[in-house]
Amino acid sequence: MSQQLPVRIATRKSPLALWQAHFVKDALQAAHPGLEVELVTMVTKGDIILDTPLAKIGGKGLFVKELEVAMLEGRADLAVHSMKDVPVEFPEGLGLVTICERGDPRDAFVSNTYNNIDELPQGATVGTCSLRRQCQLKEYRPDLIIKELRGNVGTRLQKLDDGNYDAIILACAGLIRLGLEDRIKSSIEPEQSLPAVGQGAVGIETRLNDDRIRALLAPLNHPETAHRVLCERAMNNRLEGGCQVPIGSYSLIDGDQIWLRALVGEPDGSIMVRGETTGPVSDAEELGTKLAEQLLNDGAKDILDRLYADA
């Protein structure tokens, strides 16, 4: 009988969160024909507090706490996350067990008037809620005015359309998944702006002692994506980076080798600490940790200490 119990997915109500939940539901049912899967929708603190910068209210962990409580209380079996939004640490008993194949990891330049960052006039206003995007934009174009931008994807696009910004920066993956790729004027290559840790990947969190759910999820794991994301997260973990710190990273796998590039920056773009490393895929997490140590020694510690002191 236990095999016939429905699998319950905890999800926020935003269009992108629902897309991710349905994506995992469809993948589970494709892997296990006849499996019943239900969505359990809920509102998180991050969905309610929209008038305060994320960095001031605890970062993007605000978007997952309610989902985690539902799993711990047995009201849901798993939660689906954009990996760029997943906190470094999990509550006791929960963990990340599956990482699905990565989508487009790049940032998207979105504007109704301009085609790319270079076309923006002096002093143009760009919307983003990400310190990572802000520091890289300000390094490249110190003249730009960065303005806070909160809300789901549709809300952010509407604020652009209302004339509040000359351009906004979003994640390519989110726009593509919502069928809004026509809003992308240009994709920003990692060489110009490093993405967030895990950007473009979808991860699944569940109870670590739930063998049935873990077995059902196993076919959804994409090993190459998992190695890349775990490498990036190991770097972020050593830096003690939450979701609202100016940390960027990007990894690639070629054969049995993994390459990782990362940065930590002052929010105003005045100081940028960069590094890269390569090594065996089997050492992915160790490589991420070692690169973080290098960044800390090269000045990232001072940047992060100042940020955390101001938080």
Curated annotation (Swiss-Prot):
CDD domains: PBP2_EcHMBS_like. Its cofactor is dipyrromethane. The modification S-(dipyrrolylmethanemethyl)cysteine is found at residue 243. One of its GO terms (biological process) is protoporphyrinogen IX biosynthetic process. Belongs to the HMBS family. Monomer. This is Porphobilinogen deaminase. It comes from Aliivibrio salmonicida (strain LFI1238) (Vibrio salmonicida (strain LFI1238)). The gene is hemC.
